[in-house]
Amino acid sequence: LVANEGDAWDVFLNIIDIVFETLDAKNIDIDNLPEPELYKSLKIHDIPHRIIDWVGLSVFLKIKVLAKRTAEMHINLGSESEDTAFTPTHFNGDYSVWLKNRMIYQFQNRLNSIENNLHKLDDYSLEMAKDLLSKKSLIRSKFLKFDWTKLKGERIRVHGDYHLGQILVHNEDFYILDFEGEPESTIRDRQVKQPPMKDVAGLFRSFHYAIYATIFNNENKYNKSQVALFNAAELLYGYFTGVFLETYISTVEQANLNIGYKQERNFMLEYCLLEKAIYELGYELNSRPTWAVIPLKGISNLINN
Protein backbone atom coordinates (compact mmCIF):
# COMPACT_ATOMS: atom_id res chain seq x y z
CA LEU A 1 0.00 0.00 0.00
CA VAL A 2 1.13 3.54 -0.78
CA ALA A 3 0.54 6.19 1.87
CA ASN A 4 -1.22 9.03 0.09
CA GLU A 5 -3.27 12.20 0.37
CA GLY A 6 -5.72 11.14 -2.32
CA ASP A 7 -5.57 10.90 -6.08
CA ALA A 8 -4.26 13.49 -8.51
CA TRP A 9 -7.77 14.18 -9.81
CA ASP A 10 -8.91 15.61 -6.46
CA VAL A 11 -5.61 17.40 -5.94
CA PHE A 12 -5.83 19.11 -9.33
CA LEU A 13 -9.50 20.01 -8.84
CA ASN A 14 -8.48 21.90 -5.69
CA ILE A 15 -5.52 23.53 -7.44
CA ILE A 16 -7.58 24.62 -10.44
CA ASP A 17 -10.34 25.99 -8.20
CA ILE A 18 -7.77 28.29 -6.56
CA VAL A 19 -6.49 29.30 -10.01
CA PHE A 20 -9.99 30.34 -11.10
CA GLU A 21 -10.61 32.15 -7.80
CA THR A 22 -7.43 34.12 -8.47
CA LEU A 23 -8.98 35.49 -11.67
CA ASP A 24 -11.51 37.30 -9.48
CA ALA A 25 -9.19 38.08 -6.57
CA LYS A 26 -6.65 39.79 -8.85
CA ASN A 27 -9.25 41.04 -11.34
CA ILE A 28 -7.31 39.48 -14.22
CA ASP A 29 -8.34 40.39 -17.77
CA ILE A 30 -8.39 37.00 -19.48
CA ASP A 31 -8.52 38.43 -23.00
CA ASN A 32 -5.16 40.15 -22.51
CA LEU A 33 -3.28 37.10 -21.24
CA PRO A 34 -0.66 35.67 -23.65
CA GLU A 35 -1.65 32.45 -25.39
CA PRO A 36 0.74 29.50 -25.63
CA GLU A 37 1.27 27.51 -28.80
CA LEU A 38 -0.75 24.37 -28.18
CA TYR A 39 1.27 21.16 -27.63
CA LYS A 40 4.62 22.93 -27.90
CA SER A 41 7.23 22.13 -25.23
CA LEU A 42 7.58 25.00 -22.78
CA LYS A 43 10.29 25.56 -20.20
CA ILE A 44 9.11 27.13 -16.94
CA HIS A 45 11.42 30.12 -17.35
CA ASP A 46 9.74 30.84 -20.71
CA ILE A 47 6.25 31.10 -19.18
CA PRO A 48 5.16 34.77 -19.22
CA HIS A 49 5.27 36.46 -15.80
CA ARG A 50 1.56 37.28 -15.96
CA ILE A 51 0.74 33.58 -16.25
CA ILE A 52 3.01 32.69 -13.33
CA ASP A 53 1.37 35.47 -11.30
CA TRP A 54 -2.07 34.04 -12.12
CA VAL A 55 -1.47 30.28 -11.86
CA GLY A 56 1.44 30.10 -9.44
CA LEU A 57 4.90 28.60 -9.93
CA SER A 58 4.17 25.69 -7.58
CA VAL A 59 1.47 24.37 -9.94
CA PHE A 60 3.88 24.13 -12.86
CA LEU A 61 6.51 22.48 -10.65
CA LYS A 62 3.94 19.79 -9.76
CA ILE A 63 3.28 19.20 -13.45
CA LYS A 64 7.02 18.81 -14.09
CA VAL A 65 7.20 16.10 -11.41
CA LEU A 66 4.17 14.33 -12.89
CA ALA A 67 5.76 14.49 -16.36
CA LYS A 68 8.98 12.99 -15.01
CA ARG A 69 7.12 10.13 -13.32
CA THR A 70 5.16 9.47 -16.52
CA ALA A 71 8.37 9.37 -18.53
CA GLU A 72 9.95 7.01 -15.99
CA MET A 73 6.94 4.71 -16.28
CA HIS A 74 7.44 4.49 -20.05
CA ILE A 75 11.20 4.07 -19.71
CA ASN A 76 10.63 1.08 -17.44
CA LEU A 77 7.89 -0.39 -19.63
CA GLY A 78 10.17 -0.02 -22.66
CA SER A 79 13.32 -1.45 -21.07
CA GLU A 80 12.53 -5.17 -21.41
CA SER A 81 14.94 -6.99 -23.74
CA GLU A 82 13.96 -10.67 -23.36
CA ASP A 83 10.20 -11.11 -22.83
CA THR A 84 8.76 -10.47 -26.30
CA ALA A 85 5.39 -9.50 -24.80
CA PHE A 86 7.11 -6.39 -23.44
CA THR A 87 10.06 -5.64 -25.74
CA PRO A 88 9.69 -2.42 -27.80
CA THR A 89 8.72 -2.93 -31.42
CA HIS A 90 8.41 -0.77 -34.53
CA PHE A 91 5.22 0.21 -36.29
CA ASN A 92 4.08 -2.15 -39.05
CA GLY A 93 1.26 -2.84 -41.46
CA ASP A 94 -0.64 -5.16 -39.13
CA TYR A 95 -0.78 -2.52 -36.40
CA SER A 96 -1.84 0.13 -38.92
CA VAL A 97 -4.76 -1.98 -40.19
CA TRP A 98 -5.83 -2.85 -36.62
CA LEU A 99 -5.70 0.79 -35.55
CA LYS A 100 -7.56 2.22 -38.54
CA ASN A 101 -10.34 -0.36 -38.32
CA ARG A 102 -10.73 0.34 -34.61
CA MET A 103 -10.79 4.12 -35.10
CA ILE A 104 -13.26 4.14 -37.99
CA TYR A 105 -15.64 1.79 -36.17
CA GLN A 106 -15.51 3.89 -33.01
CA PHE A 107 -15.92 7.15 -34.93
CA GLN A 108 -18.97 5.90 -36.83
CA ASN A 109 -20.48 4.78 -33.54
CA ARG A 110 -19.97 8.29 -32.09
CA LEU A 111 -21.43 9.94 -35.19
CA ASN A 112 -24.59 7.92 -34.69
CA SER A 113 -24.68 8.99 -31.03
CA ILE A 114 -24.33 12.66 -31.94
CA GLU A 115 -27.11 12.51 -34.52
CA ASN A 116 -29.39 10.74 -32.03
CA ASN A 117 -28.62 13.13 -29.18
CA LEU A 118 -28.46 16.56 -30.82
CA HIS A 119 -31.71 17.49 -29.07
CA LYS A 120 -29.93 17.16 -25.70
CA LEU A 121 -27.34 19.81 -26.59
CA ASP A 122 -27.64 23.58 -26.59
CA ASP A 123 -25.70 26.73 -27.41
CA TYR A 124 -21.94 26.15 -27.58
CA SER A 125 -22.17 22.34 -27.43
CA LEU A 126 -24.74 22.21 -30.20
CA GLU A 127 -22.66 24.53 -32.38
CA MET A 128 -19.55 22.36 -31.98
CA ALA A 129 -21.51 19.13 -32.53
CA LYS A 130 -22.87 20.48 -35.81
CA ASP A 131 -19.36 21.58 -36.79
CA LEU A 132 -18.10 18.05 -36.08
CA LEU A 133 -20.84 16.52 -38.22
CA SER A 134 -20.01 18.89 -41.07
CA LYS A 135 -16.36 17.82 -40.88
CA LYS A 136 -16.82 14.08 -40.42
CA SER A 137 -15.02 13.38 -43.71
CA LEU A 138 -12.04 15.43 -42.54
CA ILE A 139 -11.87 13.54 -39.24
CA ARG A 140 -12.22 10.20 -40.98
CA SER A 141 -9.36 11.15 -43.31
CA LYS A 142 -7.20 12.08 -40.30
CA PHE A 143 -7.64 8.58 -38.91
CA LEU A 144 -6.91 6.98 -42.28
CA LYS A 145 -3.82 9.16 -42.78
CA PHE A 146 -1.86 6.96 -40.38
CA ASP A 147 1.19 5.95 -42.46
CA TRP A 148 3.35 3.56 -40.47
CA THR A 149 6.18 3.68 -43.05
CA LYS A 150 6.98 7.26 -41.99
CA LEU A 151 7.16 6.47 -38.27
CA LYS A 152 10.61 5.83 -36.80
CA GLY A 153 9.61 5.61 -33.13
CA GLU A 154 8.77 2.43 -31.27
CA ARG A 155 5.67 0.97 -29.64
CA ILE A 156 5.72 -0.39 -26.10
CA ARG A 157 3.28 -1.83 -23.60
CA VAL A 158 1.63 1.24 -22.10
CA HIS A 159 -0.60 1.96 -19.12
CA GLY A 160 -3.60 2.11 -21.44
CA ASP A 161 -6.04 3.90 -19.11
CA TYR A 162 -3.88 6.75 -17.88
CA HIS A 163 -5.63 9.65 -16.20
CA LEU A 164 -5.43 11.70 -13.00
CA GLY A 165 -7.65 9.26 -11.12
CA GLN A 166 -5.02 6.52 -11.59
CA ILE A 167 -2.32 8.48 -9.79
CA LEU A 168 -1.85 8.81 -6.03
CA VAL A 169 -0.25 11.88 -4.45
CA HIS A 170 2.08 11.81 -1.44
CA ASN A 171 4.65 14.35 -0.23
CA GLU A 172 4.48 16.37 -3.47
CA ASP A 173 5.18 13.24 -5.51
CA PHE A 174 3.09 10.95 -7.71
CA TYR A 175 2.56 7.17 -7.71
CA ILE A 176 0.95 5.47 -10.71
CA LEU A 177 -1.36 2.49 -10.27
CA ASP A 178 -4.01 0.34 -12.03
CA PHE A 179 -2.27 -1.03 -15.11
CA GLU A 180 -5.25 -3.13 -16.25
CA GLY A 181 -5.80 -1.07 -19.42
CA GLU A 182 -8.90 0.42 -21.03
CA PRO A 183 -12.04 -1.11 -19.44
CA GLU A 184 -13.97 -1.37 -22.72
CA SER A 185 -11.11 -3.06 -24.58
CA THR A 186 -10.63 -6.80 -24.89
CA ILE A 187 -7.64 -8.40 -23.15
CA ARG A 188 -6.10 -8.99 -26.57
CA ASP A 189 -6.43 -5.32 -27.52
CA ARG A 190 -4.96 -4.23 -24.18
CA GLN A 191 -1.86 -6.31 -24.95
CA VAL A 192 -1.21 -4.51 -28.23
CA LYS A 193 1.91 -2.35 -27.99
CA GLN A 194 1.12 1.33 -28.44
CA PRO A 195 2.99 4.60 -28.90
CA PRO A 196 3.81 6.11 -25.47
CA MET A 197 1.97 9.23 -26.63
CA LYS A 198 -1.26 7.30 -26.09
CA ASP A 199 -0.77 7.59 -22.32
CA VAL A 200 0.32 11.22 -22.61
CA ALA A 201 -2.86 11.95 -24.58
CA GLY A 202 -4.93 10.23 -21.90
CA LEU A 203 -3.42 12.43 -19.20
CA PHE A 204 -3.87 15.57 -21.30
CA ARG A 205 -7.55 14.77 -21.78
CA SER A 206 -7.73 14.31 -18.00
CA PHE A 207 -6.20 17.79 -17.50
CA HIS A 208 -8.84 19.17 -19.87
CA TYR A 209 -11.60 17.42 -17.94
CA ALA A 210 -10.30 18.59 -14.56
CA ILE A 211 -10.22 22.21 -15.73
CA TYR A 212 -13.75 22.16 -17.12
CA ALA A 213 -15.12 20.06 -14.25
CA THR A 214 -13.90 22.79 -11.90
CA ILE A 215 -15.91 25.34 -13.85
CA PHE A 216 -19.06 23.20 -13.91
CA ASN A 217 -18.80 22.34 -10.22
CA ASN A 218 -18.34 25.96 -9.11
CA GLU A 219 -20.22 28.10 -11.64
CA ASN A 220 -22.02 30.13 -8.97
CA LYS A 221 -18.76 30.84 -7.18
CA TYR A 222 -16.83 32.67 -9.89
CA ASN A 223 -17.67 36.19 -11.09
CA LYS A 224 -16.47 35.74 -14.67
CA SER A 225 -18.92 34.72 -17.40
CA GLN A 226 -18.91 31.12 -18.61
CA VAL A 227 -17.43 32.24 -21.94
CA ALA A 228 -14.58 34.00 -20.12
CA LEU A 229 -14.00 30.95 -17.92
CA PHE A 230 -13.91 28.69 -20.99
CA ASN A 231 -11.28 30.99 -22.53
CA ALA A 232 -9.26 30.82 -19.32
CA ALA A 233 -9.65 27.04 -19.35
CA GLU A 234 -8.03 26.76 -22.78
CA LEU A 235 -5.16 29.02 -21.72
CA LEU A 236 -4.56 26.96 -18.61
CA TYR A 237 -4.69 23.72 -20.59
CA GLY A 238 -2.15 25.06 -23.08
CA TYR A 239 0.36 25.96 -20.38
CA PHE A 240 -0.18 22.73 -18.43
CA THR A 241 0.47 20.56 -21.49
CA GLY A 242 3.41 22.65 -22.72
CA VAL A 243 5.25 22.37 -19.40
CA PHE A 244 4.46 18.66 -19.19
CA LEU A 245 5.81 17.96 -22.69
CA GLU A 246 9.10 19.74 -22.08
CA THR A 247 9.97 17.58 -19.06
CA TYR A 248 8.48 14.36 -20.46
CA ILE A 249 10.32 14.53 -23.80
CA SER A 250 13.68 15.51 -22.30
CA THR A 251 13.45 12.67 -19.75
CA VAL A 252 12.61 9.90 -22.24
CA GLU A 253 15.22 11.14 -24.72
CA GLN A 254 17.94 11.09 -22.05
CA ALA A 255 17.04 7.42 -21.42
CA ASN A 256 17.12 6.67 -25.18
CA LEU A 257 13.48 5.61 -25.34
CA ASN A 258 12.61 6.06 -29.00
CA ILE A 259 9.39 8.10 -29.25
CA GLY A 260 10.21 9.41 -32.71
CA TYR A 261 11.30 12.74 -34.15
CA LYS A 262 9.47 16.00 -33.35
CA GLN A 263 6.98 15.97 -36.23
CA GLU A 264 6.21 12.31 -35.55
CA ARG A 265 5.63 12.97 -31.85
CA ASN A 266 3.25 15.81 -32.66
CA PHE A 267 1.36 13.62 -35.14
CA MET A 268 1.04 10.74 -32.69
CA LEU A 269 -0.05 13.02 -29.84
CA GLU A 270 -2.78 14.67 -31.90
CA TYR A 271 -3.89 11.32 -33.34
CA CYS A 272 -4.21 9.83 -29.85
CA LEU A 273 -5.91 12.96 -28.49
CA LEU A 274 -8.51 12.80 -31.24
CA GLU A 275 -9.07 9.10 -30.55
CA LYS A 276 -9.49 9.76 -26.83
CA ALA A 277 -11.84 12.75 -27.21
CA ILE A 278 -14.09 10.82 -29.58
CA TYR A 279 -14.13 7.91 -27.13
CA GLU A 280 -15.18 10.32 -24.35
CA LEU A 281 -17.88 11.93 -26.47
CA GLY A 282 -19.94 8.75 -26.61
CA TYR A 283 -20.00 8.50 -22.82
CA GLU A 284 -20.95 12.14 -22.27
CA LEU A 285 -23.74 12.11 -24.85
CA ASN A 286 -25.32 9.12 -23.16
CA SER A 287 -24.68 10.02 -19.53
CA ARG A 288 -23.94 13.76 -19.06
CA PRO A 289 -24.95 15.78 -22.14
CA THR A 290 -24.10 19.07 -20.41
CA TRP A 291 -20.49 17.89 -20.17
CA ALA A 292 -20.29 16.94 -23.86
CA VAL A 293 -18.76 20.38 -24.38
CA ILE A 294 -15.46 19.03 -22.94
CA PRO A 295 -14.68 16.34 -25.56
CA LEU A 296 -16.33 18.48 -28.25
CA LYS A 297 -13.94 21.34 -27.44
CA GLY A 298 -11.03 18.90 -27.49
CA ILE A 299 -12.06 17.67 -30.94
CA SER A 300 -12.62 21.23 -32.16
CA ASN A 301 -9.10 22.23 -31.07
CA LEU A 302 -7.65 19.42 -33.17
CA ILE A 303 -9.69 19.84 -36.35
CA ASN A 304 -9.90 23.64 -36.47
CA ASN A 305 -6.45 24.80 -35.33
PLM region spans:
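Active-site-adjacent structural elements in folded domains
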Residues: 143-150, 259-267
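Alpha-helix capping and helix-loop boundary segments enriched in small/acidic/polar residues
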Residues: 126-130, 191-194, 269
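ATP/Mg2+ or Mg2+-diphosphate-binding catalytic cores
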Residues: 127, 231-257, 267-305
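An alpha-helical support segment within catalytic cores of ATP-dependent transferases
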Residues: 110-156
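Conserved ATP-binding subdomain of kinase catalytic cores across diverse folds
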Residues: 1-116, 158-159, 164-262
